[in-house]
Amino acid sequence: MESGSRPSLGQVILLGTSSMVTAVLYSIYRQKAQVAQELKGAKKIHLGEDLKGILSEAPGKCVPYAVIEGAVRSVKETLNSQFVENCKGVIQRLSLQEHKMVWNRTTHLWNDYSKIIHQRTNTVPFDLVPHEDGVAVSVRVLKPLDSVDLGLETVYEKFHPSVQSFTDAIGHYISGERPKGIQETEEMLKVGATLTGIGELVLDNNAVRLQPPKQGMQYYLSSQDFDSLLHRQESSVRLWKILVLVFGFATCATLFFILRKQYLHRQERLRQQQLQEEFLEHEAQLLSQASPEDRESLKSACVVCLSNFKSCVFLECGHVCSCRQCYLALPEPKRCPICRREITRVIPLYNS
């Protein structure tokens, strides 16, 4: 294959990048779609008096992926908020987040940057109980921190701005980092809050437990109801599907463009080869019919008009095949009629 027919480096990089991005997006889409399908297949169980009876009749006294909703109740002690009075919960998360501006040497802009510099999570055992009074049933929640959607509520949030002197400001400007301050946050799962648990529901020694599911399914302890949770997951699936289609179309369009360019170049090469064969055949026919005196003049004739003598040497290919008038009539960019290489320089040829 000639070098002109090969895809450019930019085209190869574009095709490879778009293909790789499409593959990554498709993998994420498959994972999201699988999670949504698993949520649709989860069994909804009412937190009531018949809960233990339902589990005792289930295979292995277990529902592998169940949905249950109830109110949060501590087993023994509770956690008190450090900043809000009379705020009690069963999970407490304290975070310190640093905010600063970082100079981007590529875009020459200051960009916002934040990172967690300290985080501590405290938990105490808790149950899910029915909202109705007088129902003596509860579900013990195990390993709540393994949940992918822990329904914590922000109960306190305060930003502490950085205090800088003039010399500090100059030093930060030179270093490329300008601190803005520290954000202090407290999140809690309050006692009495409504929680939707999705996981493995097990009856063990007359006690019901909700724990992380097996087989790679996701564990949820969400403040949203099940329908809202499912709708959010399906919306995420649709978004990733659109991204896959967009990048997939871009990949197919790039591949089509490269293949079309290859096809057109091949057709042009075949056409030029056919023209050259027809010319050689016609020249041989003229030579066979011409007298010996005319054969020498025909060999020196321009391959385009066959009337004038060859008077141009084309570089870089070195072919001598055209008169000056036919060379000037060639379309831009000018190419050799024999090999189709671009003509970079012309040397006049003088016939004696």
Swiss-Prot record:
CDD domains: mRING-HC-C3HC5_MAPL
Gene Ontology cellular component terms for the protein in this record: axon; mitochondrial outer membrane; mitochondrion; neuronal cell body; peroxisome
Chief location bin: mitochondrion
Zinc finger (RING-type) stretch: 302-340
Compartments, record wording: Mitochondrion outer membrane; Peroxisome
Post-translational events: Ubiquitinated by PRKN during mitophagy, leading to its degradation and enhancement of mitophagy. Deubiquitinated by USP30.
Position(s), cross-link Glycyl lysine isopeptide (Lys-Gly) (interchain with G-Cter in ubiquitin): K52, K299
Notes on the domains: The zinc finger domain is required for E3 ligase activity.
Function per UniProt: Exhibits weak E3 ubiquitin-protein ligase activity. E3 ubiquitin ligases accept ubiquitin from an E2 ubiquitin-conjugating enzyme in the form of a thioester and then directly transfer the ubiquitin to targeted substrates. Can ubiquitinate AKT1 preferentially at 'Lys-284' involving 'Lys-48'-linked polyubiquitination and seems to be involved in regulation of Akt signaling by targeting phosphorylated Akt to proteasomal degradation.
Name of the featured protein: Mitochondrial ubiquitin ligase activator of NFKB 1
Organism for this UniProt entry: Mus musculus
Taxonomic path: Eukaryota, Metazoa, Chordata, Craniata, Vertebrata
